[in-house]
Amino acid sequence: MTGTISAPLYLLRGLQLIGWRDMQHALDYLYADGALREGTLVAINAEKMLAVEDNPEVRALIEAAEFKYADGISVVRSLRKKYPQAQVSRVAGADLWEALMQRAGAEGTPVFLVGGKPEVLTQTESRLRQRWQVNIVGSQDGYFTPEQRQTLFERIRDSGAKIVTVAMGSPRQEIFMRDCRRLYPHALYMGVGGTYDVFTGHVHRAPKFWQDLGLEWFYRLLLQPSRIKRQFRLLRYLRWHYTGKL
């Protein structure tokens, strides 16, 4: 049974988002009564909201995901503005993945890892086993051909994995999860972007101080000035926020 731990749902521009109070609430919801939920986890930030608005294929992919949660602080602020009584906090995708892996290790939940460079994936597997004794039942780096996809789906199914995390970037990872679930729906799928790189130290996140201030985007911009065009696109989201169009 997986119904006793609930979470409210909120609408932002037609997307139905889960409102988790904190990380513990998220874990308890996903592992309700010790039974892991099945479906697809997708992190929602301002950039993803814009992609949904501009690309019908992306909208269809995101709308089909069972569990959409507020990964970006701007989305959290929009939820609180639209729903003043909402008790919702940011649950960063990278942090949720680590917490989920720790819980999976404690519960003995079988995990399949997809995506990333070969050396990064190998390091990720090693650290997960050393740190939390995660039961990794299979893995595949991100360098596979379209012709190999069906065989990979079958490997995931045959492994009996109950958590499948996919680090391929959006929307490629959402397409992969949608297609794999058609063959093997009995798992929790999670799109994790560049999380393996962060976990293994190849990419550094903003210090917690910057994260707490909601300035992680600005920290990344300082390190990568080439991101400025992407940041300018987010002005449209700010307009939605301040004009009540969310």
Curated annotation (Swiss-Prot):
InterPro entries in the record: UDP-ManNAcA_Trfase_WecG, WecG_TagA_CpsF
Known EC number: 2.4.1.180
Keyword Glycosyltransferase included in the entry's annotation: yes
Listed name of the protein: UDP-N-acetyl-D-mannosaminuronic acid transferase
Catalytic activity field: UDP-N-acetyl-alpha-D-mannosaminouronate + N-acetyl-alpha-D-glucosaminyl-di-trans,octa-cis-undecaprenyl diphosphate = beta-D-ManNAcA-(1->4)-alpha-D-GlcNAc-di-trans,octa-cis-undecaprenyl diphosphate + UDP + H(+)
HAMAP family for the chain: WecG_RffM
Transmembrane segments: none
GO molecular function: lipopolysaccharide N-acetylmannosaminouronosyltransferase activity
Homology family: Belongs to the glycosyltransferase 26 family.
UniProt pathway annotation: Bacterial outer membrane biogenesis; enterobacterial common antigen biosynthesis
Naturally occurring in which organism (per UniProt): Klebsiella pneumoniae (strain 342)
Stored PANTHER family: PTHR34136, UDP-N-ACETYL-D-MANNOSAMINURONIC ACID TRANSFERASE
Alphabetical keyword list: Glycosyltransferase, Transferase
Purpose: Catalyzes the synthesis of Und-PP-GlcNAc-ManNAcA (Lipid II), the second lipid-linked intermediate involved in enterobacterial common antigen (ECA) synthesis.
Signal peptide extent: none
GO-annotated biological processes: enterobacterial common antigen biosynthetic process
Pfam families: Glyco_tran_WecG (PF03808)
